[in-house]
Amino acid sequence: MIKYSSNVWIKIILFNLFIVACLGALMRFKIGFEFPYFDQKKIQHAHSNFAFVGWVTQTLLVLIVGVIAPFLNTIQLKKYNQLLWVNLFCAYGMLVSFIIQGYGLFSIAFSTISIALIVIFTILFFKQAAQFKQYFQAIKWFKGALVFAIFSALGTVALAYMMVTKNLHQTPYLASVYFYLHFQYNGWFFFACMGLFTGLANKFNVLIKNDKLIFGLLFWSCIPAYFLSTLWAHLPIWLYIIVVAAAITQFVGWILLLKSVFYHLHLESKCSNTMMFLIYFVAIAGFVKFTLQ
Protein backbone atom coordinates (compact mmCIF):
# COMPACT_ATOMS: atom_id res chain seq x y z
CA MET A 1 0.00 0.00 0.00
CA ILE A 2 1.25 3.44 -0.93
CA LYS A 3 1.13 4.90 2.59
CA TYR A 4 3.43 2.14 3.85
CA SER A 5 5.86 2.21 0.92
CA SER A 6 6.57 5.92 0.43
CA ASN A 7 10.25 5.36 1.21
CA VAL A 8 10.38 2.64 -1.43
CA TRP A 9 8.89 4.96 -4.05
CA ILE A 10 11.30 7.75 -3.15
CA LYS A 11 14.25 5.39 -3.59
CA ILE A 12 12.89 4.15 -6.93
CA ILE A 13 12.32 7.69 -8.20
CA LEU A 14 15.83 8.78 -7.17
CA PHE A 15 17.28 5.72 -8.90
CA ASN A 16 15.32 6.60 -12.04
CA LEU A 17 16.78 10.11 -11.88
CA PHE A 18 20.23 8.53 -11.65
CA ILE A 19 19.52 6.55 -14.84
CA VAL A 20 18.35 9.74 -16.60
CA ALA A 21 21.59 11.47 -15.56
CA CYS A 22 23.72 8.53 -16.78
CA LEU A 23 22.01 8.51 -20.18
CA GLY A 24 22.50 12.27 -20.44
CA ALA A 25 26.19 11.88 -19.63
CA LEU A 26 26.51 9.07 -22.18
CA MET A 27 24.99 11.23 -24.93
CA ARG A 28 27.46 14.01 -24.19
CA PHE A 29 30.33 11.50 -24.08
CA LYS A 30 29.43 10.28 -27.57
CA ILE A 31 29.66 13.83 -28.92
CA GLY A 32 33.36 14.07 -28.14
CA PHE A 33 34.50 10.45 -28.17
CA GLU A 34 34.06 7.32 -30.25
CA PHE A 35 31.55 4.93 -28.68
CA PRO A 36 30.04 2.68 -31.37
CA TYR A 37 27.99 0.37 -29.15
CA PHE A 38 24.96 2.64 -28.89
CA ASP A 39 23.17 4.76 -31.46
CA GLN A 40 23.01 8.42 -30.39
CA LYS A 41 19.45 8.97 -31.66
CA LYS A 42 18.15 5.85 -29.93
CA ILE A 43 19.76 6.88 -26.65
CA GLN A 44 18.20 10.32 -27.03
CA HIS A 45 14.73 8.81 -27.45
CA ALA A 46 15.29 6.46 -24.50
CA HIS A 47 16.56 9.33 -22.35
CA SER A 48 13.66 11.69 -23.07
CA ASN A 49 10.91 9.08 -22.77
CA PHE A 50 12.28 7.57 -19.57
CA ALA A 51 12.80 11.04 -18.07
CA PHE A 52 9.18 11.99 -18.74
CA VAL A 53 7.52 8.67 -17.84
CA GLY A 54 9.91 7.01 -15.42
CA TRP A 55 11.02 10.06 -13.48
CA VAL A 56 8.71 13.11 -13.64
CA THR A 57 5.37 11.38 -14.31
CA GLN A 58 6.16 8.61 -11.84
CA THR A 59 7.04 11.23 -9.21
CA LEU A 60 3.86 13.25 -9.76
CA LEU A 61 1.62 10.18 -9.72
CA VAL A 62 3.22 8.95 -6.49
CA LEU A 63 2.78 12.37 -4.87
CA ILE A 64 -0.84 12.70 -6.02
CA VAL A 65 -1.66 9.25 -4.65
CA GLY A 66 0.15 10.22 -1.45
CA VAL A 67 -2.18 13.21 -1.07
CA ILE A 68 -5.41 11.27 -1.59
CA ALA A 69 -4.34 8.01 0.12
CA PRO A 70 -5.90 8.88 3.53
CA PHE A 71 -9.31 9.15 1.84
CA LEU A 72 -9.13 5.82 -0.02
CA ASN A 73 -10.22 2.41 1.14
CA THR A 74 -7.96 -0.61 0.81
CA ILE A 75 -9.32 -1.71 -2.58
CA GLN A 76 -9.08 1.77 -4.09
CA LEU A 77 -5.56 2.29 -2.80
CA LYS A 78 -4.52 -1.09 -4.17
CA LYS A 79 -5.73 -0.07 -7.66
CA TYR A 80 -3.68 3.13 -7.60
CA ASN A 81 -0.67 1.23 -6.32
CA GLN A 82 -0.97 -1.27 -9.17
CA LEU A 83 -1.13 1.58 -11.69
CA LEU A 84 2.07 3.03 -10.25
CA TRP A 85 3.88 -0.28 -10.70
CA VAL A 86 2.56 -0.70 -14.23
CA ASN A 87 3.74 2.81 -15.12
CA LEU A 88 7.17 1.95 -13.74
CA PHE A 89 7.23 -1.27 -15.77
CA CYS A 90 6.32 0.65 -18.94
CA ALA A 91 9.02 3.22 -18.25
CA TYR A 92 11.71 0.54 -18.06
CA GLY A 93 10.24 -1.21 -21.07
CA MET A 94 10.52 2.04 -23.03
CA LEU A 95 14.06 2.57 -21.74
CA VAL A 96 15.30 -0.80 -23.00
CA SER A 97 13.29 -0.94 -26.24
CA PHE A 98 14.19 2.59 -27.35
CA ILE A 99 17.90 1.86 -26.78
CA ILE A 100 17.68 -1.36 -28.79
CA GLN A 101 15.31 -0.47 -31.64
CA GLY A 102 14.39 3.21 -31.40
CA TYR A 103 10.82 3.77 -32.54
CA GLY A 104 9.55 0.23 -33.19
CA LEU A 105 6.96 -2.34 -32.16
CA PHE A 106 7.98 -2.73 -28.52
CA SER A 107 8.78 0.91 -27.75
CA ILE A 108 5.48 2.06 -29.25
CA ALA A 109 3.63 -0.72 -27.39
CA PHE A 110 5.06 0.39 -24.04
CA SER A 111 4.30 4.03 -24.89
CA THR A 112 0.72 3.11 -25.75
CA ILE A 113 0.27 1.21 -22.48
CA SER A 114 1.63 4.17 -20.51
CA ILE A 115 -0.89 6.47 -22.21
CA ALA A 116 -3.72 4.02 -21.50
CA LEU A 117 -2.58 3.89 -17.88
CA ILE A 118 -2.89 7.68 -17.52
CA VAL A 119 -6.40 7.45 -18.97
CA ILE A 120 -7.35 4.76 -16.42
CA PHE A 121 -5.76 6.77 -13.60
CA THR A 122 -7.73 9.84 -14.70
CA ILE A 123 -11.04 7.95 -14.82
CA LEU A 124 -10.48 6.55 -11.31
CA PHE A 125 -9.50 9.96 -9.97
CA PHE A 126 -12.51 11.73 -11.48
CA LYS A 127 -14.86 9.05 -10.11
CA GLN A 128 -13.48 9.32 -6.58
CA ALA A 129 -12.82 13.09 -6.50
CA ALA A 130 -15.82 13.72 -4.24
CA GLN A 131 -14.07 11.73 -1.49
CA PHE A 132 -11.20 14.21 -1.22
CA LYS A 133 -13.17 17.01 0.43
CA GLN A 134 -10.31 18.33 2.56
CA TYR A 135 -8.32 19.10 -0.59
CA PHE A 136 -11.24 20.47 -2.61
CA GLN A 137 -9.17 23.34 -4.04
CA ALA A 138 -6.33 21.03 -5.06
CA ILE A 139 -8.61 18.57 -6.84
CA LYS A 140 -9.41 20.87 -9.76
CA TRP A 141 -5.68 21.38 -10.38
CA PHE A 142 -5.10 17.62 -10.36
CA LYS A 143 -8.01 17.14 -12.75
CA GLY A 144 -6.61 19.77 -15.10
CA ALA A 145 -3.17 18.20 -14.91
CA LEU A 146 -4.47 14.75 -15.84
CA VAL A 147 -6.52 16.17 -18.73
CA PHE A 148 -3.40 17.83 -20.13
CA ALA A 149 -1.39 14.63 -19.60
CA ILE A 150 -3.84 12.81 -21.86
CA PHE A 151 -4.01 15.71 -24.31
CA SER A 152 -0.21 15.79 -24.68
CA ALA A 153 -0.33 12.16 -25.82
CA LEU A 154 -1.67 13.35 -29.18
CA GLY A 155 1.80 14.68 -29.89
CA THR A 156 3.32 11.31 -29.03
CA VAL A 157 0.87 9.50 -31.30
CA ALA A 158 1.68 11.84 -34.18
CA LEU A 159 5.43 11.39 -33.64
CA ALA A 160 5.13 7.60 -33.51
CA TYR A 161 3.12 7.60 -36.75
CA MET A 162 5.69 9.75 -38.54
CA MET A 163 8.59 7.64 -37.26
CA VAL A 164 7.02 4.31 -38.24
CA THR A 165 5.87 5.47 -41.68
CA LYS A 166 9.13 7.42 -42.29
CA ASN A 167 6.89 10.31 -43.32
CA LEU A 168 9.02 13.00 -41.73
CA HIS A 169 8.56 16.65 -42.61
CA GLN A 170 10.08 19.37 -40.50
CA THR A 171 6.99 21.47 -39.77
CA PRO A 172 4.59 18.69 -38.59
CA TYR A 173 7.48 16.92 -36.82
CA LEU A 174 8.47 19.99 -34.80
CA ALA A 175 4.82 20.93 -34.22
CA SER A 176 4.19 17.46 -32.74
CA VAL A 177 7.30 17.63 -30.55
CA TYR A 178 6.38 21.06 -29.21
CA PHE A 179 2.75 19.98 -28.73
CA TYR A 180 3.86 17.14 -26.50
CA LEU A 181 6.41 19.25 -24.62
CA HIS A 182 4.06 22.19 -24.08
CA PHE A 183 1.20 20.17 -22.63
CA GLN A 184 3.62 18.16 -20.52
CA TYR A 185 5.59 21.11 -19.11
CA ASN A 186 2.92 23.80 -18.99
CA GLY A 187 -0.03 21.43 -18.59
CA TRP A 188 0.58 18.15 -16.80
CA PHE A 189 3.69 19.15 -14.80
CA PHE A 190 2.62 22.70 -13.91
CA PHE A 191 -0.96 21.90 -12.91
CA ALA A 192 0.07 18.82 -10.92
CA CYS A 193 2.60 20.93 -8.99
CA MET A 194 -0.06 23.59 -8.44
CA GLY A 195 -2.35 20.89 -7.08
CA LEU A 196 0.35 19.69 -4.69
CA PHE A 197 1.00 23.25 -3.51
CA THR A 198 -2.71 24.01 -3.10
CA GLY A 199 -3.15 20.74 -1.24
CA LEU A 200 -0.35 21.76 1.13
CA ALA A 201 -2.06 25.12 1.69
CA ASN A 202 -5.39 23.38 2.34
CA LYS A 203 -3.66 21.11 4.85
CA PHE A 204 -2.73 24.22 6.85
CA ASN A 205 -6.33 25.48 6.49
CA VAL A 206 -5.23 28.16 4.04
CA LEU A 207 -7.69 28.77 1.21
CA ILE A 208 -6.52 30.39 -2.02
CA LYS A 209 -8.68 33.44 -2.70
CA ASN A 210 -10.32 33.52 -6.17
CA ASP A 211 -9.11 29.95 -6.72
CA LYS A 212 -11.68 29.16 -9.42
CA LEU A 213 -10.87 32.35 -11.34
CA ILE A 214 -7.12 31.72 -11.16
CA PHE A 215 -7.53 28.12 -12.26
CA GLY A 216 -9.82 29.11 -15.14
CA LEU A 217 -7.41 31.79 -16.40
CA LEU A 218 -4.41 29.46 -16.34
CA PHE A 219 -6.23 26.38 -17.63
CA TRP A 220 -7.97 27.87 -20.65
CA SER A 221 -5.03 30.10 -21.63
CA CYS A 222 -2.71 27.08 -21.60
CA ILE A 223 -4.36 25.70 -24.74
CA PRO A 224 -3.72 28.60 -27.17
CA ALA A 225 -0.38 29.26 -25.43
CA TYR A 226 0.88 26.19 -27.30
CA PHE A 227 1.30 28.41 -30.34
CA LEU A 228 3.98 30.37 -28.48
CA SER A 229 6.15 27.38 -29.35
CA THR A 230 5.27 27.59 -33.05
CA LEU A 231 5.77 31.28 -33.82
CA TRP A 232 8.39 30.16 -36.36
CA ALA A 233 5.55 28.65 -38.44
CA HIS A 234 4.39 32.11 -39.63
CA LEU A 235 1.04 32.14 -37.83
CA PRO A 236 -1.83 34.24 -39.23
CA ILE A 237 -2.32 37.56 -37.48
CA TRP A 238 -5.62 36.53 -35.84
CA LEU A 239 -3.96 33.51 -34.23
CA TYR A 240 -0.99 35.62 -33.17
CA ILE A 241 -3.38 38.00 -31.38
CA ILE A 242 -4.96 35.04 -29.55
CA VAL A 243 -1.50 33.83 -28.51
CA VAL A 244 -0.59 37.27 -27.14
CA ALA A 245 -3.89 37.38 -25.24
CA ALA A 246 -3.18 33.91 -23.81
CA ALA A 247 0.27 34.99 -22.61
CA ILE A 248 -1.18 38.07 -20.91
CA THR A 249 -3.95 35.98 -19.35
CA GLN A 250 -1.42 33.56 -17.88
CA PHE A 251 0.57 36.46 -16.44
CA VAL A 252 -2.56 37.92 -14.83
CA GLY A 253 -3.51 34.51 -13.42
CA TRP A 254 -0.07 34.08 -11.87
CA ILE A 255 -0.12 37.57 -10.31
CA LEU A 256 -3.55 36.89 -8.79
CA LEU A 257 -2.24 33.62 -7.39
CA LEU A 258 0.80 35.28 -5.82
CA LYS A 259 -1.38 38.03 -4.36
CA SER A 260 -3.65 35.43 -2.78
CA VAL A 261 -0.81 33.28 -1.43
CA PHE A 262 1.10 36.12 0.18
CA TYR A 263 -2.10 37.57 1.59
CA HIS A 264 -2.12 34.69 4.05
CA LEU A 265 0.84 35.85 6.10
CA HIS A 266 0.11 33.30 8.82
CA LEU A 267 1.24 30.64 6.34
CA GLU A 268 4.81 31.66 7.13
CA SER A 269 4.45 30.74 10.79
CA LYS A 270 3.26 27.25 9.86
CA CYS A 271 5.98 26.45 7.33
CA SER A 272 9.65 25.78 7.85
CA ASN A 273 12.29 28.18 6.54
CA THR A 274 13.09 25.67 3.81
CA MET A 275 9.46 25.55 2.71
CA MET A 276 9.21 29.34 2.67
CA PHE A 277 12.39 29.53 0.59
CA LEU A 278 10.86 27.12 -1.94
CA ILE A 279 7.63 29.13 -2.06
CA TYR A 280 9.48 32.38 -2.75
CA PHE A 281 11.76 30.65 -5.27
CA VAL A 282 8.81 29.22 -7.20
CA ALA A 283 7.00 32.56 -7.06
CA ILE A 284 9.97 34.36 -8.60
CA ALA A 285 10.59 31.61 -11.18
CA GLY A 286 6.95 31.67 -12.28
CA PHE A 287 6.96 35.47 -12.45
CA VAL A 288 10.05 35.41 -14.70
CA LYS A 289 8.54 32.66 -16.89
CA PHE A 290 5.22 34.40 -17.49
CA THR A 291 6.90 37.79 -17.92
CA LEU A 292 9.19 36.44 -20.64
CA GLN A 293 6.19 34.97 -22.44
Task: Tell where the protein language model's regions lie, with residue ranges.
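Hydrophobic alpha-helical transmembrane segments of multi-pass integral membrane proteins
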Residues: 1-293
